[in-house]
Amino acid sequence: MLIRIVRMTFREDKVDDFLEIFNNSKNKIRHFEGCHFLELLRDLDAPHVFMTHSHWETEQALETYRQSELFKTTWAATKVLFADKPMAFSSRVFVKINE
């Protein structure tokens, strides 16, 4: 399982535009083949900073999504709203602690 976190900083006047894009695409992304989890996080101290947190079956599943029309159109509409360059992190669970 691959865990993907993308940190995005938006122009403050474009946050509502981003939220509309996300709300219109979130179910399509979540149900894209290979995606098992999706959530949107908002920074506590900077409300114009968001992170998507998603789980993908494999690196290839994520790459297939990144090459899809869904990603291309969603990303094209989103990236014009940025105030700063986004940061993306791909990880795997290294140690998991259960109670």
PLM features: what roles do these ranges have?
Residues L2-T9, E39-R66:
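Short, well-ordered beta-strand segments in beta-rich or mixed alpha/beta enzyme
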Residues I5, N24, M51-H53, T73, ...:
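Residues within well-formed alpha-helices
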Residues F10-E12, T58, R92-V95:
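Non-catalytic surface loops within mature trypsin-like serine protease
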Residues K14-F37, L70-W75:
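Short amphipathic alpha-helical segments
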Residues D16, Q60-L62, K96:
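Residue-level signal for secondary-structure boundary sites
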